Amino acid sequence: AVPKLNSLPTASATIYLDFDGHMVTSSLWNGGMPIACAASGMTDAQITEVFNRVSEDFRPFNVNITTDSTKFLSAPLTQRIRVIVTPTSSWKTGVGGISYIGSFTWGDDTPAFVFCDRLGPNNPKFVAECCSHEGGHTVGLSHQSRYDEACNLTETYNTGTGTGETSWAPIMGN
């Protein structure tokens, strides 16, 4: 079983990191066809590391990062999002994750996806960054762009700098 972790259990807003598989029936994904998302296959230690990293990213905000489905289900419909961490990615090629901008408040349980098979596979740092990134989209954030010294747009998606554990990239923009 996935360890039950909560960063701020008293917050009404909730981001649920779902590692144990989920059947998605939302008509907004996969052309309306159901998606049987497999469990992530990540270890308890990897899940805990992902949770800790995502919790740190969202610490300034009044939002509970959780791996506990009961906390997600008890949160108000318009203040929650499920981020499914899954290797079930063949239906959406070329990305490490995907979500709808602003879907956090839609109230219809449209989830976000993080494709752990494409992130390492199952590298906790990469999975956590993607969870925070897709979670950021769901609350309305866009990508951070790059500009030159004259304030001209040079890239619409800032990929960051460096490699390995000391690398840096923005989670989101806006």
For each predicted feature, which ranges?
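Active-site-proximal segment of zinc-dependent metalloprotease catalytic domains
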Residues: 9-15, 20-149, 169
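Short alpha-helical segments and helix-capping/turn motifs at coil-helix boundaries
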Residues: 1-4, 66-70, 152-158
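Alpha-helix capping and helix-loop boundary segments enriched in small/acidic/polar residues
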Residues: 119-126, 155, 159-163
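Post-HExxH zinc-binding segment in Zn-dependent metallohydrolases
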Residues: 158-174
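Short amphipathic alpha-helices and their capping/turn segments at secondary-structure boundaries
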Residues: 1-16, 158-161
